[in-house]
Design a protein with these regions (language model features):
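Alpha-helical, largely C-terminal catalytic domains
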Residues: 10, 91-92, 110
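An active-site-proximal "capping" alpha-helix that borders the catalytic cofactor pocket
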Residues: 39-40, 80-95
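His-Asp-centered metal-binding catalytic motifs of divalent-metal-dependent phosphohydrolases/nucleases
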Residues: 56-75, 81, 85, 107-116
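Short alpha-helical hairpin
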Residues: 3-21
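Short gly/ser-rich anion-binding loops that grip negatively charged ligand groups
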Residues: 29, 49, 71-79, 96
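Divalent metal-dependent phosphate-bond-processing catalytic cores, especially two-metal-ion Mg2+/Mn2+ enzymes
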Residues: 1-7, 27-33, 37-52, 98, ...
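Acidic/histidine metal-binding catalytic segments
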Residues: 35, 52-58, 97-109
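Active-site flanking loop/helix segments enriched in acidic
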Residues: 17-35, 68-73
Length: 143
């Protein structure tokens, strides 16, 4: 399987990333799946342009899972959709053997992706999920 590269950004190719992709692609409608992929690419480009160092796997997981709480399969709790998605991402990542602190970082990225400004004061992966969402949905940061 060849790597997917768009605008010089390569999608990580680990088994974890393949499993994340499979789950989201099978759970979300195509519009949401493709939006989530764009969030990864936009966030990665923003990070590259700002000279930020980040973990592409964590950014990809955060980007792909960030709207999973909007899907029929993962919504329905009394929580905000961001928390539903963040909880599922953390569960999935922990079950896959991701260390708790890395899974929590993805949880924070997803939980805060609709909160302007705050993520920029946190870990790069958290900031870049939000940056990718803002660019794909609102055009913020397109310069």
């Amino acid at each position: 399987m060849s790597a997917t590269v768009i605008a010089g950004i390569e999608v990580p190719s680990s088994s974890l990333i393949r499993d994340v992709t499979e789950l989201v692609q099978s759970s979300a409608p195509p519009l949401l799946y493709h939006h989530s992929r764009r969030v990864f690419f936009w966030g990665s480009m923003r990070g590259r342009n700002r000279g930020m160092t980040y973990d592409p796997e964590l950014l990809y997981a955060g980007a792909l899972f960030h709207d999973l709480g909007l899907t029929d399969r993962f919504s329905g709790s009394e929580q905000r959709f961001e928390i539903d998605g963040a909880d599922e991402a953390r569960r999935f990542l922990l079950d896959a053997g991701v260390p708790p602190e890395r899974a929590h970082l993805v949880w924070e990225a997803i939980a805060l992706h609709t909160t302007p400004e705050v993520p920029w004061h946190m870990a790069p992966e958290i900031a870049l999920v939000t940056a990718g969402v803002e660019l794909d949905v609102l055009g913020l940061g397109y310069d």
